[in-house]
Curated annotation (Swiss-Prot):
Lineage: Bacteria, Pseudomonadati, Pseudomonadota, Alphaproteobacteria, Hyphomonadales
Compartments (UniProt record): Cytoplasm
Name under which the protein is recorded: Argininosuccinate lyase
Species this chain originates from: Hyphomonas neptunium (strain ATCC 15444)
Gene: argH
Matches recorded under Pfam families: ASL_C2, Lyase_1
InterPro entries from the UniProt entry: Arg_succ_lyase_C, Argininosuccinate_lyase, Fumarase/histidase_N, Fumarate_lyase_CS, Fumarate_lyase_fam, Fumarate_lyase_N, L-Aspartase-like
Length: 465
């Protein structure tokens, strides 16, 4: 940082100023100015503590608090005079404070280093971001629950290997993502609990000889406690790494849902139609309706995972305590949160407005011998057949149906009896896709009754109207 005479605030031992390129690579203001509110909050708490401990006079603290009021008002009004040559938000705030109140501004940094100042701001910002992102995820969950509630009995094919497996209900399918997102939200909340320790007072790395009260500043900033080791306090970035890990996992779940939207809205599947709000066209092919938002979510999920890997790579070989490698931790973290939150908003909008096609889903569910397991189960229940024998018999019946080009429900009884003579007309009662889905009544299963129960539980948990 440069003072009014152009001298860097850390430049007392240097004979020359940094080159323009050095200033360019060293500057972080464009990124960390987002922590302005957190920086001012940290300075307020620090100044109050210094005054309480008699390190700072009451008059100086009053001047500092008044100056910080003016600083934050300027920032909120968009009139704060940011100066890029001052490197970062922390030095910009201090320089402006000095312009506003004079000498007392220079006392604010007593018993504090930029090392503990920066990481305090970063923890405060990340804690708030985790809470905001968790609320967005809950909003997407609520939207999925609403759409599931509309489709508790809508039958569609369930897939393994992207091949028709068994009939399921659309409501059940959508609730699977609600469960995934709940784990994602839980990880975000857990991360917020672990990061909620205050590094302020660790100073550069070894603590300070001033009689500070770290419990006081921790409480003022809403932290559970001060961090117990000053080296760890300024060195640790695992809280950011954990946040990016949680975002990466959650983004992976968004990507899976996005991929299914791409598939379902294709003419080959025809299960759904995206609204015009969430579709784009082609510059040459007038008939096209492209699911660009879903495709972009897939791509951006990879970007978030890349940010996690980049931060992990930056941290993995760093000795204690601080190194400038850590400056980009905020660039990666801020962009990961921004990107993820954008994806959640886009996905919520798509789910809210997507039109499902129950008839097409039902027709697809009836193909591919999706009720073969139901036939095998019937052989076990009604004829007392061991399941492995029933599996073999069913396979032979499927082969006959395939040879005749019909589904199991349309295969004549005599064809089934040619495989096993004890099969009766009653078998057809389990071979419709509706009967198949309805029969899956175990806890967590796909029957409309079970799905309705799950919807009711989620409505209560998420307070969905």
């Amino acid at each position: 940082m440069a003072d009014d005479k152009g001298q860097m605030m850390w430049g007392g031992r240097f004979a020359a100023t940094p080159s323009a390129i050095m200033e360019e690579i060293n500057a972080s203001l464009d990124i960390d100015r987002r922590m302005a509110e957190e920086d001012v909050a940290g300075s307020r708490a620090h100044a109050d503590m210094l005054a309480e401990m008699g390190i700072l006079s009451v008059a100086d603290n009053e001047a500092i608090q008044g100056g910080l009021d003016a600083v934050i008002e300027e920032m909120r009004a968009g009139t704060f005079p940011f100066r890029r040559e001052l490197e970062d938000i922390h030095m910009n705030v201090e320089a402006r404070l000095k312009e506003l109140i004079g000498e007392p501004a220079g006392r604010l940094h007593t018993a504090r280093s930029r090392n503990d100042q920066v990481i305090t701001d970063f923890r405060l910002w990340t804690r708030r971001a985790l809470d905001e992102t968790g609320q967005l995820v809950a909003g997407l969950q609520a939207m999925l629950v609403r759409r599931a509630d509309e489709n508790t009995s809508t039958v569609m094919p369930g897939f393994t290997h992207l091949q028709t497996a068994q009939p399921v209900t659309l409501g059940h399918h959508l609730l699977a993502y609600v469960e995934m997102l709940e784990r994602d939200r839980s990880r975000l909340l857990d991360c917020a609990v672990r990061l909620n320790e205050c590094p302020l007072g660790a100073a550069a790395l070894a603590g300070t000889g001033f009689p500070i009260d770290r419990d006081m500043t921790a409480e003022a900033l809403g932290f559970a406690r001060p961090m117990a080791n000053s080296l760890d306090a300024v060195s640790a970035r695992d809280f950011a790494l954990e946040a990016l890990s949680s975002l990466s996992i959650a983004a992976t779940h968004l990507s899976r849902l996005a991929e299914e939207i791409v598939l379902w809205t294709s003419p080959q599947f025809g299960f759904a139609r995206l609204s015009d709000q969430w579709s784009t066209g082609s510059s040459i092919m007038p008939q096209k309706r492209n699911p660009d938002a879903a495709e972009l979510i897939r791509a951006k999920a990879s970007l978030i995972t890349g940010h996690f890997s980049a931060l992990q790579g930056a941290i993995k070989a760093l000795p204690l305590a601080y190194a400038k490698d850590l400056q980009d931790d905020k660039r990666l973290t801020f962009d990961a949160f921004d990107t993820f939150n954008l994806c959640v908003r886009a996905m919520t909008g798509m789910i809210e407005t997507i039109s499902f096609k129950p008839d097409a889903m039902r027709a697809a569910a009836a193909k591919g011998f999706s009720t073969a397991t139901d036939l095998a189960d019937w052989l076990v229940r009604e004829l007392g057949m061991p399941f492995r024998d029933a599996h073999h018999v069913t396979g032979r019946i499927v082969a006959r149906a395939e040879a005749k080009g019909v589904d199991l429900a349309d295969l004549p009884l005599k064809e089934m009896q040619a495989v096993h003579s004890a099969i009766t007309q009653e078998v057809y009662g389990v071979l419709s896709v509706e009967a198949s889905a309805a029969s899956r009544t175990s806890y967590g299963a796909t029957s409309p009754v079970r799905v309705a129960e799950q919807v009711a539980q989620w409505k209560q948990r998420l307070r969905v109207e």
